[in-house]
């Protein structure tokens, strides 16, 4: 039996977790050299309170705290949407529970943010953290969603940090942790070209010969040149606006395509796992397994053919009934 100051792990063995007088469990962690995989973790201390108290930090203070602890250069709460900071926090609290080599510290796109949050979810599951991560909300980069989550994570950090030294730059092996772009900024900031240098009137002015000293242009010709230069400048602005809009559409379509491809690969992996399970239990002659295999391997044509006999059976059943009525 464990001593009065120790607890049992979920599997029942003595894991040397220490219980303070107030009942708080301090997880036991084995001091090991970084890079080893023989870590011994206790359960993480779960935090459920999300109410605002005097200890709740302002958005400026909490960003300063994040930058100080894990050596980042974030300027806004919204930049936490990449998930990279949380991954490094988990490595700090529970060394080895997450592989920082897989974390995208220079993430700039939404699917890269989702990748980081999946790593965070895996570390939460490994450490028995009950918190549900609202990934879909966080990756959008909205202020309130990210503020609520970092406020909770600060309390989770305070409940689990044991005061050990930690070098965040060395832990991520010198990876440049570039802050993600501000979600409010425009993605495409094309340099504005000088209208005077690129306008047709500028080229015409250069190619036109010098006016003779004795000649004076008439008023109608000067009015025509003024109107043509004004229309040319307006057309340049319209073209630049169209280019910016088209670039934004192309970028949004690329993001949508990447998201669809990622979702396709995700569900294909699930189907592959189901297929392997069915193959493992296929020799048991289970009707459910056989039915699942038929569904997995059925093509569109086969599914259409399976529906046709049912229709024919219904028509055959209706004919005897009609004959009996007569």
UniProtKB/Swiss-Prot annotation:
Q: In what way is this protein post-translationally modified? A: Phosphorylated at Ser-235 by CK2 leading to enhanced cell adhesion. Phosphorylated by CDK1 and AURKB during mitosis reduces the binding affinity of MAPRE2 for microtubules.
**What molecular function terms (GO) are annotated for this protein?**
identical protein binding; microtubule binding; microtubule plus-end binding; protein kinase binding
Give the family per the record. Answer: Belongs to the MAPRE family.
Q: Where is this region: APC-binding?
A: 258-301
Write down the PANTHER family for this protein, in alphabetical order.
Answer: MICROTUBULE-ASSOCIATED PROTEIN RP/EB FAMILY MEMBER (PTHR10623)
What Gene3D superfamilies does UniProt report for this protein, alphabetically? 1.20.5.1430, Calponin-like domain (1.10.418.10)
Keyword terms of this UniProt record: Cell cycle, Cell division, Cytoplasm, Cytoskeleton, Microtubule, Mitosis, Phosphoprotein, Ubl conjugation
Keyword Cell cycle listed? The answer is yes
Q: What is known of its domains?
A: Composed of two functionally independent domains. The N-terminal domain forms a hydrophobic cleft involved in microtubule binding and the C-terminal is involved in the formation of mutually exclusive complexes with APC and DCTN1.
**Record PTM Phosphotyrosine, positions in chain:** 166
* InterPro entries xrefs: CH_dom, CH_dom_sf, EB1_C, EB1_C_sf, MAPRE
Its name, as the record gives it, is Microtubule-associated protein RP/EB family member 2
Q: Where is the composition biased (Acidic residues)?
A: 300-312
Function, please? Adapter protein that is involved in microtubule polymerization, and spindle function by stabilizing microtubules and anchoring them at centrosomes. Therefore, ensures mitotic progression and genome stability. Acts as a central regulator of microtubule reorganization in apico-basal epithelial differentiation. Plays a role during oocyte meiosis by regulating microtubule dynamics. Participates in neurite growth by interacting with plexin B3/PLXNB3 and microtubule reorganization during apico-basal epithelial differentiation.
Subunit details: Interacts with DCTN1. Interacts with APC (via C-terminal). Interacts with monomeric and polymerized tubulin. Interacts with SLAIN1. Interacts (via the N-terminal region) with BAG1. Interacts with ASB14. Interacts with HAX1; this interaction is essential for epidermal cell migration.
The chain positions of domain Calponin-homology (CH) read 56-158
